Amino acid sequence: MSEAIKTDVLIVGAGPCGLFAVFELGLLDVKVHLVDILDKIGGQCAELYPEKPIYDIPGIPMITGHGLTESLLEQIKPFNPTFHLNEMIETVEKIGDPGFRVTTDAGKVFECKVLVVAAGGGSFQPKRPPVPGIEAYEGGSVHYAVRKMEEFRDKDLMIVGGGDSALDWVLNLHPLAKRITLVHRRDDFRAAPHSVEQMRALVASGQMDLLIGQVTALDGEGKELSAATVKGNDGTTTKVACNAMLPFFGLTMKLGPVANWGLHLENNLVPVDTGTFETNVPGIFAIGDINTYPGKLKLILSGFHEGALMAQKAVKYVYPDKRVVFQYTTSSSSLQKKLGVN
């Protein structure tokens, strides 16, 4: 076992709620490390909608998931948090009062006084479409999320699906791609009506293609696609040139090892005290989409509020003998000094 990394607080999840919690804890002189199963910072914002607009962040009329992540990282820079990406927490062992020993699937060990679970609903995994051999092209021509729109410039792009994600990316990537072919198993879409109307207008004007059926075969070399075969509902097959594919078959969410940490669960969510966002285990808190309480709204702004209240209780575990006085960043010279603004 490797030597333990000691920290005041360990946050599981580096999405917006986890990042803002770093800010609130940093104002209270609390040292933080974060662990995330993803290979990037930002949680759902980075994985699912990095370039899609978000309209309900207070004071910001519109911002992308990527933009929000970057702004939060800039905000917490004075507190110098440490990130551990591509790692999943496997075990949590109580070693003190307070105190936990936490291990990851990479063999890393942490010792912390407080554990904050900000892992969304668990880890998101895209549903793989039932196409023989598609896994061979994952990480190459087959993408389950759009992280950089420029990756699809001048591509023969096939988008598979009939929901909002599929239609949104048809419309957003149409100006960049060489040609887009949308494939759906039926001529009936579960997307916003105005998106469907715009897509049909592009098809009618010959600017993109729509095939009703299912992808049954892929051609290519290594991880690079060259064509995909679509079988129509009438049994006819069409081979389409395709060097990039975006399948949108939904996502599965796995709670993972959180279920084994001794936390009470309700429908795979963690009940919390709404005054502190502490779980049934003293010293373990849950903020963001992973928690539940009466009136819970799964909004980013709700997670920010939860992180602020969590920090006020967590600091008492870190500094049990310290009198903590609540201060405002607008008027406290000591807080402004921590933020580097005076």
From Swiss-Prot:
Q: So what does this thing catalyse?
A: 2 reduced [2Fe-2S]-[ferredoxin] + NADP(+) + H(+) = 2 oxidized [2Fe-2S]-[ferredoxin] + NADPH
| Alphabetized GO MF terms | ferredoxin-NADP+ reductase activity; flavin adenine dinucleotide binding; NADP binding
| Magnesium found in the keyword field | no
State the coiled-coil residue ranges. none
- Describe how the cofactor binds: Binds 1 FAD per subunit.
From what superkingdom does this record's organism come?
Answer: Bacteria
Give the keywords, sorted. FAD, Flavoprotein, NADP, Oxidoreductase
Enzyme Commission (EC) number: 1.18.1.2
Q: Does the keyword Oxidoreductase apply?
A: yes
Name the cofactor(s) required for activity, per the record.
Answer: FAD
> Which HAMAP family does the UniProt entry name for this protein?
FENR2
Tell me, how does this one assemble? Homodimer.
Protein name per the record: Ferredoxin--NADP reductase
Organism equals Rhodopseudomonas palustris (strain BisB18)
Taxonomy, top ranks, is: Bacteria, Pseudomonadati, Pseudomonadota, Alphaproteobacteria, Hyphomicrobiales
